[in-house]
A protein has these predicted regions:
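TPR-repeat structural position
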Residues: 96, 132, 175, 216, ...
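DNA major-groove recognition helix of helix-turn-helix/homeodomain DNA-binding modules
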Residues: 48-66
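Flexible helix-coil transition and linker loops at the boundaries of alpha-helical arrays
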Residues: 72-73, 106-114, 145-157, 188-197, ...
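Eukaryotic all-alpha helical interaction scaffolds
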Residues: 103, 146, 189-190, 223, ...
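A short, Lys/Arg-rich alpha-helix, primarily the initiator
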Residues: 1-19
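Tandem amphipathic alpha-helical repeat scaffolds
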Residues: 80-93, 116-132, 159-173, 198-214, ...
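Short alpha-helical DNA-recognition segment
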Residues: 20-39, 342
Length: 444
């Protein structure tokens, strides 16, 4: 049976069986099992034509009327697919209330061909609403229902559901679990299916999660792997994310000339395509590159562009890194009064967004603000807070940084505390070595 036809035939069989109040077991007999009937209804390919005809005969369905019934079912499927596409557009446009209303009006049963897609969208909507447990339940349902569903396999629903699970973990500051889900999503990806961009979104997100963990080398390996395929990616923002990621990772590795090249190329690409969010990120990294070169005049010029763009974005977590780096720039210039308001604002936004990787960077910078002015006791509370957050969320690079800075503070105050901190540094470094990825200790 043609794979396209089996889907519509299966829908006709499912509809007629349910209209007659029959269970799968009621239709099964010694010649056909409930599992085989379920496969036919779900449009599983490679089902025996004889089995399909046998079920049709058992239901008394006329072969003459079947094309007409299939056309009707195909129209219904197309209508539902359109409604689901509308829901996804509304979610992406942050019109979540209307999206929720449309999802509620659909309420597809689990054996419907689009049920996995429905639950994936429900999970996506709940992530936007920051209802993590309910989102993860919906996405787990989507993944469960993908098994044997040819429509879901063709649409790469399972792969995308894993991507959304990774985002849920990322927003809850569980980077290791987020990376795990991206790996599962990549394993589930169907290269012959639709929505091929999902593969590159998964790779991009995995790179970002590793970057947040301070694991520069494995993140850069992902970027290097994807780079020759950038022309295949049909999402401009995803392409620009790779420009930002490559520039940021090279900067952290000290390869400043190359980092600048990719930042500038990305800025030009983003400008031509009016992608403001990417301009924000790329100007931020370019300003940081100039700061690393101690070219503070150009760094300030870059950050001025970033600050002029900030009103375009509701995503306040974007500002945490930018404000932190501007604060660091002013500290390098010894303009302490200019630095503190930016660091205060970075911490405030990091706390509000519960963005632990960015918050720990801001807190570290504030600790540096006090320590570099000779106020080590005031700095201690910031570094201690970083250590607790980093330890709780398995951010080993940042935990190492916290113990190192704590040891700097205690060195001239309390030798016992100094020794304790250096021992902790050694323990964390051993853990980093086991990870075989945490090579860069620069967090901002």
């Amino acid at each position: 049976v043609d794979p396209l036809e089996i889907r519509e035939i299966g829908e006709v069989i499912r509809k007629v069986r349910k209209e007659r109040g029959m269970r799968l077991e009621d239709l099964a007999d010694e010649h056909i099992s409930p599992a085989t009937i379920s496969n036919i209804e779900r449009g599983v390919p490679h089902v025996s034509k004889d089995k399909v005809n046998y079920v049709l005969e058992k239901l008394g369905l006329s072969l003459d009327r079947l094309p007409e019934m299939m056309t009707g079912e195909q129209k219904k499927l197309e209508d539902i697919r359109l409604q689901l596409a509308a829901v996804e557009s509304l979610i992406d446009a942050q019109e979540t209330k209307l999206a929720a209303e449309k999802l509620e009006s659909l309420q597809l049963e689990d054996d419907h061909p689009f049920a996995p897609h429905f639950h994936r969208l429900r999970g996506k909507y709940l992530i936007y609403e920051r209802k993590w447990n309910r989102a993860e339940k919906a996405l787990s349902n989507a993944i469960r229902l993908c098994e044997g569903n040819s429509q879901a396999e063709r649409m790469n629903v399972e792969s995308d559901a894993y991507n959304l699970l990774s985002l849920s973990c990322y927003y809850q500051n569980d980077m290791a679990k987020a990376v795990h889900y991206t790996d599962q999503g990549l394993e589930a990806f169907n290269p012959e299916g639709e929505r091929k961009h999902v593969k590159y979104v998964l790779l991009r997100n995995k790179g970002i999660y590793l970057e947040r963990m301070g694991r520069v080398v494995p993140a850069l390996r992902i970027v290097d792997k994807v780079w020759p395929e950038l022309g295949k990616i049909d999402q401009t923002e995803t392409v620009l994310s790779f420009y930002w990621l490559r520039s940021e990772l090279l900067r952290r590795g000290g390869v400043l000339d190359e980092a600048m090249k990719y930042a500038q190329e990305g800025i030009e690409f983003a400008r031509k395509n009016w992608v403001w969010i990417s301009l924000f990120d790329l100007w931020t990294v370019l300003g940081t590159i100039y700061m690393d070169r101690k070219d503070y005049e150009n760094a300030k010029a870059c950050f001025d562009v970033v600050l002029s763009l900030q009103d375009k974005f509701p995503e306040k977590e974007l500002f945490i890194t930018t404000y932190t780096r501007i604060g660091i720039m002013y500290m390098n210039l010894k303009e302490w009064d200019q630095a503190k308001p930016f660091l205060d604002e970075a911490i405030k936004k990091g706390e509000y967004m519960n963005d632990v990787p960015r918050l720990t960077m801001a807190l570290t910078a504030m600790g540096d603000y006090y320590r570099l002015q000779g106020n080590s006791r005031e700095a201690l509370s910031y570094y201690q807070r970083v250590e607790k957050l980093a330890n709780r969320h398995n951010l080993k690079e940042m935990e190492y940084e916290a113990w190192f800075r704590l040891s700097q503070c205690w060195k001239d105050i309390d030798q016992e505390e100094f020794r304790r901190c250096t021992e902790k540094m050694f323990i964390v470094q051993e853990e980093l070595d086991r990870q075989k990825g945490g090579v860069s200790r620069e967090m901002v």
